[in-house]
């Protein structure tokens, strides 16, 4: 590829992603990670005590662990300054937990995801679609035929409230527990949003689900969590698309 073509490709990419919506948040924490921050996140989500305690235990593990410096094949993260990151921003929208109809979203949120290329044709070709803006899922939809078979595709915050037994059993317990490394502990303390997928026994979901994640604010960290419980005979691997501005400042 010529240098002119490289430049055109970079220009097209920047034109697509380098835009920012000037929007007010409904709630956001201060920069950095403290016990107060973790409690505020849990309180804002009206979480049960068991999830709040898990967050606080993860915070303790984070504070005790050194910054990893020798991960094979991974970039050096020793210079990452969590004290300069805002870990939680809830956008100012009326529907928490994700609107089920795209038209119910505020126009500015719709416009943001339309600019990122989420066409109706693609949404109709998927089993389910989720979209996260900052720290919250703003849209979540599952095709009715899968819901009738007992398949669950919802945001993680709703799953904590409506499927507590499943979340409590599987959330960061065996795959990647907070004790695995410092960033796993960080995630366990401040996670927000993300997708929950449950496929019951003797059920196969042939079509994929897809989740989109958008970071709009400067200096924020987005810590979405995806939990997949597939007890059925098969499920298509969920796809995810992280659309983020071409950042010129620290984000995580």
Briefly describe each language-model feature range:
Residues 2-245, 251:
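Glycine-rich and polybasic anion-binding loops at the starts of cofactor/ligand-binding domains
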């Amino acid at each position: 590829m010529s240098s002119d073509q490289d430049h055109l490709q970079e220009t097209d990419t920047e034109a697509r992603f380098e835009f920012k919506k000037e929007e007010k948040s409904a709630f956001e924490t201060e920069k950095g990670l403290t016990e107060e921050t973790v409690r505020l996140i849990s309180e804002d989500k009206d979480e049960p005590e068991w999830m709040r305690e898990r967050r606080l235990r993860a915070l303790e593990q984070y504070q005790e662990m050194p910054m990893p410096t020798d991960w094979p094949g991974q970039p050096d993260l020793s210079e990452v300054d969590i004290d300069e990151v805002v870990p939680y921003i809830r956008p100012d929208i009326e529907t928490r937990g994700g609107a089920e109809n795209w038209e119910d979203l505020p126009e500015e949120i719709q416009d943001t995801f339309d600019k990122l290329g989420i066409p109706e044709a693609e949404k109709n070709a998927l089993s389910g679609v989720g979209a996260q803006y900052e720290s919250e899922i703003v849209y979540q939809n599952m095709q009715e035929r899968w819901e009738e078979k007992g398949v669950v595709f919802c945001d993680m915050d709703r799953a904590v409230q409506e499927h507590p037994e499943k979340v409590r059993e599987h959330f960061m317990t065996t795959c990647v527990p907070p004790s695995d490394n410092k960033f796993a502990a960080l995630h366990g303390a401040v996670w927000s949003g993300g997708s929950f997928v449950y496929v019951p026994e003797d059920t196969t979901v042939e079509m994929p689900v897809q989740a989109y994640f958008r970071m709009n604010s400067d200096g924020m960290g987005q810590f979405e969590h995806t939990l997949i419980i597939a007890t059925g005979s098969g499920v298509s691997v969920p796809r995810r698309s992280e659309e983020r501005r071409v950042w010129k400042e620290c984000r995580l």
